[in-house]
């Protein structure tokens, strides 16, 4: 697993203007779901543009261990021959998801609908993350889960339900992972499985279920929520999937281009699902020059080409209801806020505390060690932007790929270089990050 590797420190130095065109890797959320739904479908699923980072590769290995035929046919081109809903076989060994909470939690939902037993495990970071929020609804549906750790943490053994039950479930927090696990388990249950969320979370699972032939209905629920109803026991059919570029990965070169003066870059095929564009909305409110063109779509997911130019940013207040649409982007937004003029307040960030690290504390520490005034007030992050960042600090990444990439983006425009203690975990989501940024003009050493 990745956490057994030697640390790979790296320093980012003040760079000249960034220029060029790039395509960031395929979206991680779509890549996981394409593999899992391809494995649950009947027939062949061809996937192009799959993210070939460690997290997604571990999901591919897990689907193979569960009985699906999963093979790489070319550069980011994959083919899956599925086993059908409830058709998984008991794996011979534990399913190791490395650092991937998404792959692990979605696979738990998929396995919960098959009458098999599977053990789920991961690296030290994933073992520390809460799983009870996934386990609770799956147990209501008839699955049985045994964990030797407090809070239902990994490693755990999951026995899928022989006769899964449809449920109506209200998610305790806005979470696409909880919602998706319940819906994937609900594929094997007769009748209607319903998930109600008070704040709308990413809807990639719903869109892809429809693409594979499931009947799913989404309705508004309250001011910001959704009610999702799935008709169980469909025959999913294999379908082609084109994976758009990951907006969460595009966030790093995007913010780097905004804060490095004179930059002018283009990012192609970036997903523009409205439940993933909170960062772009916020950056534009801050005064960012971000233009989109060539808007199109595949499998229900829109994508576009973005032109991003160096901009003078101002502080803004980010409302808590925006969090689900940009939960993975707050770290790099904090970097933009540090270079802005004025105070930026990001509200309602409690979910950052249970990511690959406590990202709320880690973000504050990343800024403080580089001379930025920052405060945590409850679940709010307050950044005092001064138009520049002193830099000169060493950032502890805590085995978190997004902390590493955020800190490196910051170092490209800070007064003094910024060092990250370990870049190894960048490979989980963006293996080509450093060379791609160097092609745009970034200076690392």
Swiss-Prot record:
Residues the entry annotates as binding 3-phosphoshikimate: 28-29, 33, 175, 177, 328, 355
Subunit-structure text: Monomer.
Enzyme Commission number: 2.5.1.19
GO molecular function list: 3-phosphoshikimate 1-carboxyvinyltransferase activity
Organism: Rhodopseudomonas palustris (strain ATCC BAA-98 / CGA009)
Function according to Swiss-Prot or TrEMBL: Catalyzes the transfer of the enolpyruvyl moiety of phosphoenolpyruvate (PEP) to the 5-hydroxyl of shikimate-3-phosphate (S3P) to produce enolpyruvyl shikimate-3-phosphate and inorganic phosphate.
Name used for this protein in its record: 3-phosphoshikimate 1-carboxyvinyltransferase
InterPro entries: Enolpyruvate_Tfrase_dom (IPR001986), Enolpyruvate_Tfrase_sf (IPR036968), EPSP_synthase (IPR006264), EPSP_synthase_CS (IPR023193), RNA3'P_cycl/enolpyr_Trfase_a/b (IPR013792)
Functional pathway: Metabolic intermediate biosynthesis; chorismate biosynthesis; chorismate from D-erythrose 4-phosphate and phosphoenolpyruvate: step 6/7
Keyword entries, A-Z: Amino-acid biosynthesis, Aromatic amino acid biosynthesis, Cytoplasm, Transferase
This protein's record includes keyword Transferase: yes
Reaction(s) catalysed by this chain's protein: 3-phosphoshikimate + phosphoenolpyruvate = 5-O-(1-carboxyvinyl)-3-phosphoshikimate + phosphate
Coiled-coil regions listed in the entry: none
SUPFAM superfamilies cross-referenced by the UniProt entry: EPT/RTPC-like (SSF55205)
